[in-house]
From Swiss-Prot:
It comes from the Bacteria. This is Large ribosomal subunit protein uL10. GO terms for molecular function: large ribosomal subunit rRNA binding; structural constituent of ribosome. It holds the Pfam family Ribosomal_L10. InterPro entries: Ribosomal_uL10 (IPR001790), Ribosomal_uL10-like_sf (IPR043141), Ribosomal_uL10_bac (IPR022973), Ribosomal_uL10_bac_type (IPR047865), Ribosomal_uL10_CS_bac (IPR002363). One of its GO terms (biological process) is translation. Belongs to the universal ribosomal protein uL10 family. Forms part of the ribosomal stalk, playing a central role in the interaction of the ribosome with GTP-bound translation factors. Part of the ribosomal stalk of the 50S ribosomal subunit. The N-terminus interacts with L11 and the large rRNA to form the base of the stalk. The C-terminus forms an elongated spine to which L12 dimers bind in a sequential fashion forming a multimeric L10(L12)X complex. It comes from Pseudomonas fluorescens (strain SBW25). HAMAP family: Ribosomal_uL10. GO terms for cellular component: large ribosomal subunit. Signal peptide: none annotated. Keywords: Ribonucleoprotein, Ribosomal protein, RNA-binding, rRNA-binding.
C-alpha cells in the first residue's frame, strides 16, 4: 500500500518525537505473529508506558537520524517493530522479552540505551534494570540493615562496658 508524502512526513515526525522523549528503544521482527497477539502486545505496551509501532525501515532511519537511536540503523531490515520506553528504560525490553516467551516467531533484534547498541543477547541487561520503586526499596533495605547493625553493635559495646564495670 502506497503512502503519500504528507503521511510519510507525519509518521517520521511522530516517531522522531517518541524517540526524543524515550529512555531506550528495542527493535524486533514480528513476522508471523498473529493480529490478536499483536493487539495484546500493544495493549500491554500502552499500560507499561511503551510506544510501539511498525514502521517502514527507510522512514524509521529518517526518524531516528538525529537521535541516540541511530545506532540501530543496521538492524532496520525486514518488517521492523520498534518500541520506545518512556517511563522506565527497561520497560520495552521486559515487555518484548515476556512476549517472546509465548511467540516462537517473534524475534528481538537489538536495543539501544543511552546511545549504546545492545545486541539481542544483551537485552537481559536492560530488561533486568530495577524500576524506580524497586531501586528505592533496595536502597531502603540496605540503609535499614546498616542502621540495625549499628544499633546492635552499640548495644553490645554498652553491655560489654556494663559487664566490665560490674
Amino acid at each position: 500500500m502506497a503512502i503519500n508524502l504528507e503521511d510519510k512526513k507525519a509518521i517520521v515526525a511522530e516517531v522522531n518525537e517518541a524517540a526524543k522523549a524515550a529512555l531506550s528503544a528495542v527493535v524486533a521482527d514480528a513476522r508471523g505473529v498473529t493480529v490478536s497477539a499483536m493487539t495484546g502486545l500493544r495493549k500491554e505496551a500502552r499500560e507499561a508506558g511503551v510506544y510501539v509501532r511498525v514502521v517502514r525501515n527507510t522512514l524509521l532511519k529518517r526518524a531516528v537520524a538525529d537521535t541516540e537511536y541511530s545506532v540501530l540503523n543496521d538492524v532496520f531490515t525486514g518488517p521492523t517493530l520498534i518500541a520506545f520506553s518512556t517511563d522506565h528504560p527497561g520497560a520495552a525490553a521486559r515487555l518484548f522479552k515476556e512476549f517472546a516467551k509465548g511467540q516462537d516467531k517473534f524475534e528481538i533484534k537489538a536495543a539501544a540505551f543511552e546511545g549504546k547498541f545492545l545486541a539481542a543477547n544483551q537485552i537481559d541487561v536492560l530488561a533486568t534494570l530495577p524500576t524506580r520503586n524497586e531501586a528505592i526499596s533496595q536502597l531502603m533495605s540496605v540503609i535499614q540493615g546498616a542502621t540495625s547493625k549499628l544499633a546492635r553493635t552499640l548495644a553490645a559495646v554498652r553491655e560489654q562496658k556494663e559487664a566490665a564495670a560490674a
